[in-house]
Structure formats: structure tokens, C-alpha cells
Amino acid sequence: HDENAFSFGGVAGHAGVFSCAWDLAVLARTLLNGGVYGRSRILSEESVDLLFTDFNTAFPGDEHGLGFELYQHWYMGAMATPRSAGHTGFTGTSLVLDPTTDTFLIVLGNSVHPVRSWRSGSAPRVATANQLARAVPVRPERGRTAWFSGMASASTATLTLPALRLDSARARLECALWWDTEPASDGLFLEASTGGEDWQPVPFTTVRPGPGHRPDPLPHPAGSVTGWSGRVWHRLEADLSVWRGKSLQLRWRYTTDQLYVGRGAYVDALRVRDGGRTVFDSERPRDAGRIGATGWVLSAD
């Protein structure tokens, strides 16, 4: 496929992903192990960390470590995280390393053979990466299943609670939330309606679990999240007191653009409290059966 290399007897003055799958797997495993393969240390942990560290912070969206690109959905697909590193080759080859799930993906192919008009860009890379990302499970926060948005592009999925009458000044929504979306392009929105037609954003806070002290709640005044939750469940609370004395519906709306997606969004352990009363609990079978899902599915992983 490389006419210049052919004319020079096989010599090519450029770099790319050139080797067999096994050699690349050894390289990937070594880097994910922090520089160790088997019983041999090849690189120091400090050196490996530099490969996964963004040194291009002045240019958001163009994250780059030493030698590797970082967080690039255009070929990493749903494997992309702020710590995911990768490299591509001209003919559609790619190597993606995701330390957050301890997984790697090698794609070897020749999309310009026998003719360059066959070139398919990064679509095979993204499709394969999405499948691998989906194969890594996200376990429910509670119980056997959680609501999953799916990973479809150019779509809108809604998860709607039944209409609930709220009479307390301390009414609130509580749930567990997990998200991984293409930053800014895709998002998860919490919305409310008193008539089932005009929906407005519901501000909320999230708390990421951590060792030791309880972290401060992170406000989401626009009632939405995008990007990466750190591959952990967050506790969400939303103040619903503004709808006191009204019948209220709540819904989650997950939207994606036409190009790339992340691992998706999960919602679990949904509860609506009206003061001292729990007026909705997704763990109660009767309440669970009243949830309206379009595009969302109950998933064990």
C-alpha cells in the first residue's frame, strides 16, 4: 500500500503501528501493568505514567501524552476516557489502552488494499471499540438490574416516572447515577413537567463516593451531566420543593449526536420522597411497573 516504501526497496521514513497482534498485545499488557511484563520490568512506573498524562492542556479536545493520543472518541469509540491512550496507522490500524478497565484493543487491517477507494476511515475502529467497551460490565448500584440508556448514536432515549403529587416543602428525588458520554456532544438531562408536555430542567447535585470524609456535593444547575463519571456510581439528589402542591412527572433524557458515543448512562435506586413519605421507589414492583422507558432497558451489566 505504500508506494514510496516500495520504490525505496521497502524502506519507509515514517512511524505507525507495524507489527503482529501478539507483539502489540505484549506492548499493551506491559503498559497497562505499569511497565512490567511477566517478571521483567521494561519501563519505570513514572515513565509509563507520562504516556497517559495530558501535556496538551492548552488545547482541549486534543489531549496528548508522550507518544500517545488521549481521550479521542473518533477512533477509540466508547473506550475513550481521560486516561485512555492510543495510536493509529494509515491503513486503519489502531491500538487503544484503557487503564480504567484494564483492557486493550488492537485493530490490524489494510483499508487501502487492493485500491485506496476502499478506505473506510475509522468506522471499523470505532465499531470494534464500542463492542469491547460494552462487553466490560457496569454492575447495578443496588439489586440485579439498573436502567441503561444504550449506546446508539443520533438518538434520544427517555426514562419517565409516573405523575406524583407533592405536598411537602422537603420533596426530593434520590437515585444513583453513572455516565460516560462524548463530552459536550452527548448528554443526560433530568427534566420535570406538570402536564406531560412542557419539560424544564431540574437542577441537582451529585456526590462521588470516596474514602475517608464525605465529599461536598457537586452542583449541576443546568440539570445535566456530560463526559465521564470516573466509572463509579454517584449519589444524586434534586430538590423538588418548587413543585409543592402540584402533580409532577420526572424524566431522564439521554441524547447523542450522529458521530460517536460513550459507554452510556445508568440510573438505579430511584426514590421520590415527599417529606417523611416515600411516594415512589423503583425497588417496589408496583412502582417499577409504572416507569415509562423509550430506548432505556433494564440491564444487569
For each feature predicted by the language model, list its residue ranges:
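Secretory-pathway/luminal and periplasmic proteins that interact with or process carbohydrate-rich
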Residues: 53-63, 183-184, 258-260
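Penicillin-binding protein/beta-lactamase superfamily catalytic region
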Residues: 1-61
